[in-house]
């Protein structure tokens, strides 16, 4: 029996993790489209080695590329199980595929995801940030920066009649800034990582 188990709501628990090397294991999760949360846990067969944690990773395999692993979080002897939300990770994968023009069948669609477990030193694992938190932090930072710029630029707004007739400054209509602000907000809501492409 494996050290690790996986639970997906409505399915039997899985413990068929396959060793990739001495510190890394994988398990396939079929029909991933309907899965929003999953649980990874220690089965209790034996404890993890002292000073180690099990870092948990998610990958949505792509037939045309190497797996991209996203860190979900960790479990260890003092925290033997954890629930991970993968709905946002699946959505960001779909948005990334659309951004790269892979919408209408130019890419094979995989219905099997993989969960990876990597035994790593506790200090290394403690310094990692889960993928979902990073995406949310990026979105929040982008929105705050957007609001700050909008407020700053709008504080300099003047009516056309107040612009000096002989001025070396370039003036931008405020409606242009408002349109940019609205478009940026919309795009940020649709895909917080749109600016990367």
From Swiss-Prot:
It comes from the Eukaryota. One of its GO terms (molecular function) is nuclear import signal receptor activity. GO terms for cellular component: cytosol; nucleus. Signal peptide: none annotated. InterPro entries: Hikeshi-like_C, Hikeshi-like_N, OPI10. Pfam families: Hikeshi-like_C, Hikeshi-like_N. One of its GO terms (biological process) is protein import into nucleus. Belongs to the OPI10 family. This is Protein OPI10 homolog.
């Amino acid at each position: 029996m494996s050290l690790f188990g996986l639970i997906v709501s409505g399915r039997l628990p899985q413990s068929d993790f396959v060793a990739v090397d001495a510190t890394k294991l994988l398990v396939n999760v079929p029909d991933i489209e309907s899965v929003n949360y999953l649980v990874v846990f220690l089965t209790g067969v034996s404890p993890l080695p002292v000073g180690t944690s099990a870092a948990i990773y998610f990958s949505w395999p792509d037939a045309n590329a190497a797996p991209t692993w996203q860190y979900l979080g960790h479990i260890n002897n003092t925290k033997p199980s954890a629930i991970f939300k993968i709905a946002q990770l699946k959505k960001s994968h779909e948005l990334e595929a659309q951004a790269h023009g892979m919408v209408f069948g130019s890419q094979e669609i995989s219905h099997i995801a993989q969960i990876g477990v990597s035994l790593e030193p506790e200090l290394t694992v403690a310094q990692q940030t889960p993928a979902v938190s990073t995406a949310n932090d990026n979105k929040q930072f982008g929105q705050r920066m957007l609001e700050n710029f909008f407020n700053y630029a709008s504080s300099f707004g003047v009516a056309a009649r107040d612009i000096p007739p002989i001025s070396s400054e370039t003036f931008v209509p405020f409606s242009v800034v408002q349109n940019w602000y609205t478009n940026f907000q919309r795009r940020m809501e649709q895909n917080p990582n749109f600016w990367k492409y």
